[in-house]
A protein has these predicted regions:
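Sequence/structural segment immediately N-terminal to covalent heme-attachment motifs in c-type
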Residues: 14-44, 112-137, 149
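Bacterial signal peptide processing site
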Residues: 8-11
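Inter-heme linker and motif-flanking segments adjacent to c-type heme-binding CXXCH motifs
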Residues: 47-48, 74-77, 102-116, 129-130, ...
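C-terminal motif of bacterial Sec signal peptides marking the signal peptidase cleavage site
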Residues: 4-6
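Extracytoplasmic c-type cytochrome modules immediately beyond a signal peptide or single-pass transmembrane anchor
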Residues: 24, 53, 61-102, 108-112
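C-terminal capping alpha-helices of c-type cytochrome domains
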Residues: 86-108, 178-204
Length: 204
């Protein structure tokens, strides 16, 4: 009887570990199923799709968790992400965030000539560097932006400009984005997209 109980306990622990681990949740979508699986849009290694689904690999776990919480609470607008986040409980969101934070960051594709030609380090330094770090590597105050798809970065900046996105707490991003001209938004997006990704500490 004791042996049977111990065996049962081990199986339960193993089932929970494999059934609710961050990678398994990202692959399966949890209660939401394949339609809401992270890998459907963000790729099997969190590399993004080069368009409207950003790179997740190597981003700080705390940042990733906060974005899922904000989507679930309706503080950040995106219909699919809202539903995907709501299908996960708070513990599952933590596991998914830790999974992607532990993956090695990688660029989806090499920099284009257009991106290199549009590089504007001076504009980035004055508008973004204080919070997002040199070459967009991220700081404790802002997530990494380097190697994210230019389309995605442009979309996010435009969302900040019209207050569609406003989940930064103190609204620094809201105010900064609204100061940018359309051409500057594009230049910044292309500049950041060309910078190779770099690992960041897992506890950031």
């Amino acid at each position: 009887m004791v042996l049977a109980t111990a065996c049962s306990d081990r199986m339960t622990s193993s089932d929970d570990r494999w059934g609710r681990g961050g990678e398994l949740i990202a692959m399966s979508g949890g209660e939401g199923g394949a339609r809401y699986a992270c890998v459907t849009c963000h790729g099997p290694r969190g590399e993004g799709n080069g368009f409207d689904a950003p790179r997740l690999a190597g981003l700080p776990a705390g940042y990733l968790q906060k974005q899922m919480e904000d989507y679930a609470a309706g503080l950040r607008a995106h219909e699919v992400m809202r539903d995907a986040a709501r299908f996960l409980d708070s513990h599952e969101r933590v596991r998914v965030a830790n999974h992607y934070a532990a993956l090695p960051p990688q660029a989806l594709s090499p920099a284009t000539e257009e991106a290199i030609a549009a590089a504007t380090p001076g504009l980035y330094a004055s508008a973004c560097q204080q919070c997002h770090g040199v070459e967009g590597v991220g700081t404790v105050n802002g997530p990494p932006l380097n190697a994210q798809p230019a389309f995605y970065l442009t979309q996010q900046l435009q969302d900040w400009q019209v207050s569609k996105r406003r989940n930064d707490g103190n609204h620094v991003m809201l105010k900064m984005a609204q100061q940018l001209k359309p051409a500057e938004v594009r230049q910044l997006s292309l500049y950041l997209a060309r910078i190779p990704p770099r690992p960041v500490p897992l506890d950031r």
